[in-house]
């Protein structure tokens, strides 16, 4: 008998060796990166689109990108299938008999052990039993007809894959080699497969494969680095029947059976093993469900269990309807409300049934999730918990106590709201990631790295905090539930959670499918009485509901708006808020005192309404701030004067949205100036450079804090850095103006350099003063010596440091050298900070001197005239202006530039 790859079949099992079986690969090529991707087994290639790209790859999580190499996706798919060693014995029962102890067909060597098979890139995971053909020839071949790679590429040597990818059976297997001629033949294999009613046929050594593929339970592969940590367990019965848990993959030498034979051999040990594995993967969830039903736990635990049920839905399979979820919740509610009021429960059930009869009012997917073309910065708010639109709405209630959001007397509305949100999220997107994240509700106030949005407006008066209406950044509501009107999503309408001092009017605050998570496009309309209302471009607000939603209705800090509201109805412990919904009231508990954030004194004078026009554009959103009620005009005038004098932090100064837009505009001007300079238009580029420098100064002033002692280190660092960089840009502009003999403009630019450096030194002064004192204490003056009265402290410090350093060099005593070691090493940071401070002061004074020289040169060189005199006078006014009020200085600089350029 001829040898096959160095393996000589023995007489005991030569007749029982099965013929090798070919499992065919299916590949698809990306039309963008032209990389081939191995398709899962059973994929119907006729269902693939004509234009296929890597982003459509959905069977390997996190690998649907063109930058992933071809080998990575192939190896990742192969890694999902593992080989299980079958039993050593093979029973003889005929040509089409599959022994129960054999899980996958294989080839055996002379000693009865399993021969080492070559690992294939398309190894199939299948737990069904395959028959061993007793009448097959005993010869065991490893020719290329055992495998047909669809891309006509050579396969790596078998010994490499044997040692690398089958470590479990290495000690039982014998490495086999493959000749170059045999590998060459594998290039000419066909990619097509033939299936006829489940019976696989072999035509001209073109082996086919079964088109039904067993799915992969992701619980089997938690150790794979490409598998997400949050593995989805699939409850769907159809999914369970269609997909099965398997622990072994079919080898190259396996002979595929027909689908009918697989169904008839359903009772083999491998199927039993798979069933046990499948049951084990669902054990935790079933036990958790049983424990919840038996122990009658609190309602929020029910929500956690239901959230787990939502996460286990197959997002790419059949979708559940709202009614099915409501039926499930109603069945579980029987345990939750055990011993409760049955009459109230019946009323709640009737309300839900009525809500089902009004599908036209059910919130649409856009009410909870922003469209793909817009930034998903909008948030839903519920009792100090933010949930971004990217998160599953069921997490809104995950970490909350059972009575923190809704009382147990009204559980069904909360259930339905969560179910409605989850169902909409499932139906509105074809693929939802299982990884979720919670957004911290406490945003850093005035953070310079905020997105293009407005920072939250807060009131430091805690006694009147419930009377002030606040709006949060990006058009959302602020995090503190005690001072907001928090809209909550329900299937048929929205119920606003009102703070103390406000009363719900009508059945709901907003109705219809208005996108609540974002402001949308808001129009300003001044109705009679100067009441500003918001047109949400959906079902509009009713006149009696406008004040409840108006974010600027209470600009007066004395609670002007809340005087017209009905007194708050207090619940138990005086901390519950009641919402009017027709004749029904929902009791809300909030724990306001514990969750209320502390507010700095610098925010006490923040105004809500302003006479200034500020525009915010983000996506399709646009908010216009207009004047508010005349009753608050006196207070607004005082607040605005405080802002101009720099006495208090204003919304404009702390507005992250304005800072971001100003910074973007300044950078755009600088880039445009660079392009003009590259084209040789130096005069035009200089004007744009200087205008960009002025805008950078404005951005740095917005990051300032009026009270340096209470300022945050992050804001101070941002402001100092911006001032230092802007000073260099202004210096560049000044030198450019001097080259063009525009001395008046150069004087203005030098003035900006002076202001920028003085501002930077101003914020460095506290640390510089401490550094000076620290260094002063280190370098003590020797007894009997007294410094000159005309010398400064820094001069004394330098002179003593140098003299002692020289004496240290001259002496040979190590003790003397050790005494001055702290000055050289330990205080290096103090020295560097002090030098940076002195450098800023020196550069500022140098810019002052140059600005005076430039204005003098401009006055002597230009012809006298009224326009010239006015321009020079305005420039002198700018030069005499102090550096504290940057905004006023920028206004004067622009005015002077207009006068000198006319």
From Swiss-Prot:
- Signal peptide residues are none
* Main location as per UniProt: nucleus
- Gene Ontology molecular function terms on file: zinc ion binding
Tissue range of expression? Expressed in leaf sheaths, flag leaves, nodes, internodes and panicles.
**Span of zinc fingers (CW-type):** 21-74
Q: Where is this region: Disordered?
A: 131-233, 326-345, 420-480, 537-651
Q: Where does Zn(2+) bind?
A: 30, 33, 54, 66
Keywords linked to the UniProt accession = Metal-binding, Nucleus, Transcription, Transcription regulation, Zinc, Zinc-finger
Please tell me one Gene Ontology term that the record gives under cellular component: nucleus
UniProt xrefs under Pfam families: THD_CWZF3-5-7 (PF24756), zf-CW (PF07496)
Output compositional bias ranges, type Basic residues: 204-213
Q: Residue ranges under compositional bias (Basic and acidic residues)?
A: 151-169, 193-203, 214-233, 335-345, 612-625
Task: Give the compositionally biased regions (Low complexity).
Answer: 421-433
Query: Where, per UniProt, does this protein localize?
Result: Nucleus
Briefly, what is this protein's role?
A: Binds to histones H3K4me1, H3K4me2 and H3K4me3 in GST pull-down assay. May facilitate the recruitment of effectors to mediate gene expression.
Which protein is depicted? Cysteine-tryptophan domain-containing zinc finger protein 3
Query: What organism is recorded for this protein?
Result: Oryza sativa subsp. japonica (Rice)
Gene that encodes the chain: CWZF3
């Amino acid at each position: 008998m001829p040898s096959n790859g160095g393996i000589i079949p023995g007489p005991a099992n030569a007749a029982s060796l099965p013929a090798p079986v070919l499992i065919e690969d299916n590949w698809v090529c990306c039309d963008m990166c032209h990389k081939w991707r191995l398709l899962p087994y059973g994929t119907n290639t006729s269902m693939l689109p004509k234009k296929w790209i890597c982003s459509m790859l959905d069977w390997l999580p996190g690998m649907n990108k063109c930058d992933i190499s071809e080998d990575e996706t192939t190896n990742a798919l192969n890694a999902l299938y593992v080989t299980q060693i079958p039993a050593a014995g093979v029973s003889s029962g005929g040509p089409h008999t599959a022994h129960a102890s054999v899980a996958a067909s294989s080839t055996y060597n002379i000693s009865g052990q399993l021969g080492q098979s070559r690992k294939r890139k398309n190894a199939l995971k299948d737990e069904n039993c395959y028959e061993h053909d007793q009448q097959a020839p005993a010869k065991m071949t490893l020719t290329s007809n055992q495998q047909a790679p669809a891309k006509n590429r050579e396969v790596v040597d078998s010994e490499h894959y044997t040692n690398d990818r089958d470590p479990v059976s290495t000690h039982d297997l014998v490495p086999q080699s493959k000749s170059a001629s045999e590998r060459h033949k594998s290039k000419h294999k066909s990619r097509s497969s033939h299936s006829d009613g489940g019976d696989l046929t072999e035509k001209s050594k073109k082996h086919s494969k079964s088109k039904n593929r067993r799915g992969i339970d992701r619980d089997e592969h938690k150790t794979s680095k490409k598998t997400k940590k949050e593995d989805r367990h699939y409850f769907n019965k159809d999914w369970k029947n269609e997909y099965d848990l398997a622990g072994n993959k079919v080898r190259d030498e396996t002979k595929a059976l027909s689908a009918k034979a697989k169904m008839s051999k359903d009772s083999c040990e491998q199927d039993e093993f798979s069933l046990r594995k499948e049951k084990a993967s669902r054990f935790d969830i079933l036990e958790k469900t049983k424990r919840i039903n038996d122990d009658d736990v609190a309602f929020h635990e029910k929500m956690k269990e239901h959230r787990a049920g939502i996460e286990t839905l197959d997002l790419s399979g059949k979708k559940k309807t709202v009614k099915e979820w409501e039926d499930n919740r109603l069945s579980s509610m029987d345990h939750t409300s055990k011993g409760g009021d049955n009459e109230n429960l019946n009323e709640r059930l009737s309300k839900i049934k009525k809500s089902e009869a009004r599908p036209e009012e059910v919130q649409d997917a856009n009410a909870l999730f922003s469209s793909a073309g817009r930034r998903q910065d909008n948030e839903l708010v519920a009792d100090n918990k933010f949930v971004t639109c990217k998160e599953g709405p069921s997490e809104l209630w995950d970490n909350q106590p059972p009575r923190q959001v809704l009382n147990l007397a009204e559980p069904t509305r909360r259930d339905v709201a969560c179910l409605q949100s989850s169902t909409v999220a499932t139906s509105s997107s074809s693929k939802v990631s299982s990884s979720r994240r919670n957004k911290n509700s406490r945003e850093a106030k005035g953070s310079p790295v905020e997105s293009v949005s407005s920072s939250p407006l807060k009131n430091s008066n805690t006694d009147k905090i419930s009377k002030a209406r606040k709006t949060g950044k990006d058009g959302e509501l602020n995090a503190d539930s005690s001072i907001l009107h928090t809209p909550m999503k329900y299937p048929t309408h929205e119920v606003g959670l009102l703070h103390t001092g406000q009363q719900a009017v009508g059945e709901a605050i907003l109705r219809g499918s208005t996108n609540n998570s974002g402001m949308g496009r808001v129009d300003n309309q001044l109705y009679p009485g100067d009441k500003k209302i918001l047109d949400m471009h959906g079902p509009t607000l009713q006149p009696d509901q406008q004040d409840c939603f108006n974010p600027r209705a209470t600009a007066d800090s004395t609670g002007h708006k809340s005087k017209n509201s009905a007194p708050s109805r207090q619940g138990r412990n005086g901390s519950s808020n009641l919402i009017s919904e027709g004749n029904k009231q929902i009791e809300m508990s909030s724990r306001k005192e514990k969750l209320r954030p502390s507010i700095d004194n610098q925010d006490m004078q923040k105004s809500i309404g302003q006479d200034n026009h500020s525009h915010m554009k983000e996506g399709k959103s646009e908010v216009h701030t207009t004047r508010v009620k005349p009753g608050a005009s006196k207070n607004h005038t005082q607040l605005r004067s405080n802002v101009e004098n720099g006495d208090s932090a204003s919304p404009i100064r702390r507005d992250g949205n304005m800072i971001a837009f100003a910074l973007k505009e300044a950078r755009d001007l600088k880039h445009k100036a660079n392009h003009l300079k590259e084209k040789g238009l130096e005069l035009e580029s200089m004007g744009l450079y200087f205008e960009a420098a002025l805008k950078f100064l404005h951005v740095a002033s917005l990051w300032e804090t009026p009270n340096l002692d209470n300022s945050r280190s992050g804001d101070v660092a941002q402001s100092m850095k911006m001032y230092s960089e802007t000073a260099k840009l202004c210096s560049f502009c000044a030198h450019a103006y001097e080259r063009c003999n525009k001395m008046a403009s150069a004087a203005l630019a030098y003035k900006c350099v002076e202001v920028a450096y003085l501002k930077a030194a101003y914020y460095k002064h506290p640390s510089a003063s401490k550094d000076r004192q620290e260094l002063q204490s280190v370098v003590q003056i020797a007894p009997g010596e007294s410094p000159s009265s005309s010398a400064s402290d820094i001069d004394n410090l330098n002179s003593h440091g140098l003299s002692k350093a020289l004496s240290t060099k001259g002496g040979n005593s190590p003790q003397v050298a050790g005494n001055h070691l702290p000055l050289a090493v330990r205080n290096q940071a103090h020295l560097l900070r002090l030098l940076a401070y002195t450098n800023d002061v020196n550069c500022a004074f140098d810019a002052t001197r140059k600005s005076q020289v430039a204005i003098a040169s401009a006055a002597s060189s230009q012809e006298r005239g009224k326009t010239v005199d006015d321009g020079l006078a305005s420039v002198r006014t700018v030069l005499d202006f102090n550096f504290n009020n940057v905004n006023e200085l920028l206004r004067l600089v622009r005015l002077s530039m207009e006068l000198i350029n006319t």
